Amino acid sequence: MDALRRILQHEDESLPLDEAALLLARIEYPDLPLAPWLAELDFHARQIRRLSLYGFRNAAHNYLFGELAFSGNGDDYYNPRNSCLNSVLESRRGIPITLSIVYIELARRLGITVDGIPAPGHFLVRIEDDGDTYYIDVFNNGKIRDDIEGEVDPRFLVPATKRMILIRMLNNLRLIYLQRQAWHKAAAVLDLLLLADPGDADALRQRAAARAALHHYQAACSDLSRYLTLRPLDPGKDELKAQISNLRRMHAHKH
């Protein structure tokens, strides 16, 4: 996970996106080996190369969305496994961002640049082909979004960096794990988000809740204290101070 942490802290972006996404999947699958899934991506890239007489975009479309039937998992959208690259490769179902990573990484193996586009609410990929620009909705069977430039603020059509993609994935998992009260996994996600942005007050408050649920009372106290430093005018500050006092008592009782 050290390589993942370096990306999030702006220290190093040399790790390929597929490896970074698989490392992130270890929150859900702690013993996940990377090599078999990287090999599967290699295999799919070779299959697309075999079809590339028709150009990468057409070959990738026919192979991924035709032969393999990759598609969006609309029936179980908020399953955390949709954010795990290994699970998406196995089930051929996922959410926009993980399906986009599959597309981006297959293209990279063939020397083709494909950008991830962080459109609001729906991640897309963008490819240049024969002088034309195509926005592809991998969640909807590779549909070409001809309308996107007229509908979306140009600021959201700037390609996402690797770090931005990982943070977006982490934010997806944050919501899911908090809603499911999967406190260990939520805390792991929030640790990474706070590495990326130590001043994320909301993440601090959420991690405090996760830590308290895990009986890590002193650590929860620390997070709430930092939260109040960042948000001194929070309307609920008196209640939060009472929570801190209560957590300190619980920590003292525990020890």
Short names for language-model regions:
Residues 1-255:
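A structural boundary/capping signal
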